Curated annotation (Swiss-Prot):
Protein function: Component of the exocyst complex involved in the docking of exocytic vesicles with fusion sites on the plasma membrane.
Stretches that traverse the bilayer: none
The name this protein goes by in its record: Exocyst complex component 6B
Family: Belongs to the SEC15 family.
GO biological process: exocytosis; Golgi to plasma membrane transport; intracellular protein transport; membrane fission; mitotic cytokinesis; vesicle docking involved in exocytosis; vesicle tethering involved in exocytosis
Length: 811
């Protein structure tokens, strides 16, 4: 029962659920009915629900039928009216179709026109859009075209600026266009191209200034020369408030605008063409010859590109290489002045360019870099000049070189480079210049001395007399009073040598100009060089003349006279140096001239040569002596050779009238002593083993002839018998043997007042031995044999006593 109740309860619940589902189906949209139906299929009462659903459908059909039946008449009427309307509608449709056909026919052209208008409007919109886009693109294209034009005309820095504007201002506005992407891709390439082209221009510039450095330097040195000439003119004229040209005035200010489109700023040649200037026009500035725009452009371009340091390093490296090339002198530079000039021009040109770069760029080169280059250049230049100047043997070339070095130093000093070392080196070259002058003047003196006739200068008129006196400081009142023609005591080489000494002093003075030396230094330099000229060059030249083999006594006498007058002229040379240097001789540390010593030495050498020459002549005459030492005949006159010798000596000493008295007296005494010594040697020589009393008698006649010559006073100034003393040894020896006064000799030997004081026992013994041998072999007088034996015994006795004197003397 309970089970029945439970089934009934379940049936009621199912029925209620089905009712709910049906209401949902009726009230729910068809699209959302799926979940409701799923709940039916999920349950177990599917059949009942279908039955319930059929029941509900039948109920609704009945209600619909009832409703239709209630409204049927109205429906029929409506259908009737609808049928009527359909006919009218058909008519209306036909009319509309006909109207449409007519309208289509009539509006076909309009439609075509409208279609054309539509296309036109579309084109207008497209054109307008295109114009707008082109207005955005046109500046880009214009800038790109401008960039290309600038690249084509080599305006690289403006091109780089244009490229910057193009990249950062214009291209971002139209970056979605394909051509812009192409441009963007080309920008790095263009930058590299600009960079490469500007570097190429820089290389061309560097190569150009390397080739034209000598022209730049030549112009700069001409400017410096003009300025120096102008300063010299100003210094010679009264001036008020004048100022020396400053370093700033040496520069030509370059107003080079890098972005300028002027032809000059866009030229890539480092050197501008300069027309030949007229002589009276100003020499163009060194920088006027150079267009530095390639350097400025390249510097700015690399700065903009962030590679300034790379550019600076490259520029300095290349210029260092060029400096080494410039500083390498040609091997034949020393041969001509043009070689030195070209070398200096290149160095000056190099540093003029670098100095201008230093003052017109910000940091491309700095003072430390310039100083480093200059130190290197200075050391190499000085080394090259020392080497090549040492080859110079022409003093004129050395002097021209000195002037060129001074101009070189002055030019670089204007640009602020220290040049003290160059002037120090010039002091070294000064010594070399002095040596070349000494060599040149050695040739001049040699020519003068070789061409001189060594005869007093004859003058036949007042003009000739004044001409000689004007060339050489000579005063002689007695000579002035003499009538013409008359003669100066000296020969022509005296005024010539004196004037050449003055010319040498002038040549030394020329070198000291522009060396910034004080008057005392110049005076000291001239005096030292002149002393070298006198003590070495002129002295050697005089000594060479004096020592010549073919020099005659007349020439030697004239040389002594000439050197005497040159010695007197030394004070005038002192005055001459004082006048040109304005340094008084009394100044402390002033070097004195050694001319007096030089001429004294030369005169003494000439005197010695006279003595030697005289002795040689005497020896030549003595070689003609032909004594018969075994003769028994007694002669009555002197030997012929001796007579000729005495005649030669008389004529020779007659020439000595112009010599100083002591010189003539010394020469005469020397000749007599040498003659006496030679005669003594002739008498005692070993080859003469035997001699007779007759030979001694002849020898005695020759000695008497010599004594007669000495007594005649061939040279004035000797006291009585002074000259005869030269023959006193011979006289006493001959008297001893001829008078055979051995008892007196042996008795008085060693006493101060001995009659034969000058006879040496050795000499007497030697001569006695020669006579003893003769006595032994002489058999001519047999009837006097006892007398001969007595004489022989006497000779032996005397010889024995002489040996005793000799041995006692030695002991």
């Amino acid at each position: 029962m309970e089970r029945g109740k439970m089934a009934e309860a379940e049936s009621l619940e199912t029925a209620a659920e089905h009712e709910r589902i049906l209401r949902e189906i009726e009230s729910t949209d068809t699209a959302c009915i799926g979940p409701t139906l799923r709940s039916v299929y999920d349950g177990e009462e599917h059949g009942r629900f279908m039955e319930k659903l059929e029941t509900r459908i039948r109920n609704h059909d009945r209600e619909i039928e009832k409703m239709c039946n209630f409204h049927y008449q109205g429906f029929v009427d409506s259908i009737t009216e609808l049928l009527k309307v359909r006919g009218e509608a058909q008519k209306l449709k036909n009319q509309v179709t006909d109207t449409n056909r007519k309208l289509q026919h009539e509006g076909k052209e309009l439609v075509i026109a409208m279609e054309e208008l539509k296309q036109c409007r579309l084109q207008q919109r497209n054109i307008s859009a295109t114009v707008d886009k082109l207005m955005l693109c046109l500046p880009v294209l214009e800038m790109y075209s401008k960039l290309r034009d600038q690249m084509k005309t080599k305006r690289h820095y403006p091109a780089l600026k244009t490229l910057e504007h193009l990249e950062h201002t214009y291209l971002p506005q139209v970056s979605h266009y394909r051509f812009c992407k192409v441009m963007v891709d080309n920008i790095p390439k263009l930058r590299e191209e600009i960079k490469d082209v500007s570097m190429s221009d820089l290389k061309d510039f560097l190569e150009s200034i390397r080739k034209h450095s000598d022209k730049i330097g030549e112009t700069a040195m001409k400017q410096a020369q003009q300025q120096r000439n102008l300063d010299n003119i100003v210094l010679q004229q009264p001036r008020i408030g004048s100022k020396r040209k400053s370093k700033k005035d040496a520069y030509i200010i370059f107003d080079t605008e890098i972005e300028s489109t002027s032809p000059k700023s866009e030229q890539d040649s480092g050197i501008l063409d300069v027309e030949d200037e007229e002589d009276d026009e100003e020499v163009p500035g060194a920088q006027d010859l150079v267009d530095f725009s390639p350097v400025y452009r390249c510097l700015h371009i690399y700065s903009v590109l962030g590679a300034r340091e790379t550019f600076e390093n490259y520029y300095r490296k290349q210029r260092r290489k060029q400096a080494r090339l410039v500083l390498q002198p040609p091997s034949n530079m020393h041969e001509t002045l043009d070689g030195y000039r070209k070398y200096f021009n290149q160095i000056v040109g190099f540093f003029v360019v670098e100095d201008h770069i230093l003052h017109t760029t910000q940091g491309l080169v700095n003072r430390a870099y310039i100083d480093e280059l200059w130190e290197m250049a200075l050391s190499k230049t000085i080394a090259a000049l020392r080497t090549h100047s040492s080859y110079c043997s022409d003093p004129n070339l050395v002097l021209d070189l000195k002037n060129l070095i001074v101009l070189f130093a002055d030019t670089l000093q204007v640009y602020g480079f220290p040049v003290n070392q160059l002037f120090d080196m010039l002091l070294e070259i000064r010594d070399q210049y002095s040596e070349t002058l000494l060599k040149k003047w050695a040739g001049i003196f040699r020519n003068i001395l070789d061409s001189d006739n060594y005869s007093p200068i004859p003058v036949t008129s007042e003009e000739m007399y004044k001409k000689v006196v004007g060339q050489f400081p000579f005063q002689d009142i007695e000579l002035e009073k003499q009538p013409f023609p008359k003669k100066f005591p000296f020969s022509e080489f005296v005024p010539k040598v004196y004037n050449q000494i003055k010319e040498f002093i002038y040549a030394c003075l020329k070198f000291s100009e522009d060396l910034h030396l004080s008057s005392t230094e110049v005076d000291d330099m001239i005096r030292k060089s002149t002393n070298l000229l006198l003590t070495r060059t002129l002295s050697n030249s005089l000594q060479n003349v004096i020592k010549r083999k073919n020099i005659g006594l007349t020439e030697l006498v004239q040389i002594i006279i000439n050197t005497t007058h040159l010695e007197k002229s030394c004070k005038y040379l002192e005055e001459f140096i004082t006048n040109i240097t304005n340094v008084l001789p009394e100044t402390v540390h002033t070097t004195k001239l050694y001319g007096t010593t030089t001429f004294k030495d030369a005169r003494h050498a000439a005197e010695e040569e006279i003595y030697t020459n005289l002795n040689q002549k005497i020896d030549q005459f003595l070689q003609l002596a032909d004594y018969d030492w075994m003769t028994g005949d007694l002669g009555n006159k002197a030997s012929d050779y001796l007579v000729d010798l005495i005649a030669f000596l008389r004529s020779t000493f007659a020439v000595f009238t112009h010599l100083p008295g002591k010189v003539a007296q010394t020469a005469c005494m020397s000749a007599c002593k040498h003659l006496a010594t030679s005669l003594m040697q002739l008498l005692l020589e070993a080859e003469v083993r035997q001699l007779t009393l007759g030979a001694l008698q002849q020898f005695n006649l020759d000695v008497r002839e010599c004594e007669q010559f000495a007594r005649s006073g061939p040279v004035p100034g000797f006291q009585e018998d002074t000259l005869q003393l030269a023959f006193i040894d011979l006289r006493q020896l001959l008297d001893l043997f001829i008078q055979w006064d051995w008892s007196t000799y042996l008795a008085d030997y060693g006493q101060p007042n001995c009659k034969y004081l000058r006879v040496n026992p050795v000499t007497a013994l030697t001569l006695l031995e020669k006579m003893k041998d003769t006595s032994r072999k002489n058999n001519m007088f047999a009837q006097f044999r006892k007398n001969e034996r007595d004489k022989q015994k006497l000779i032996d006795t005397v010889a024995k006593q002489l040996r005793g004197l000799i041995s006692s003397h030695h002991s």
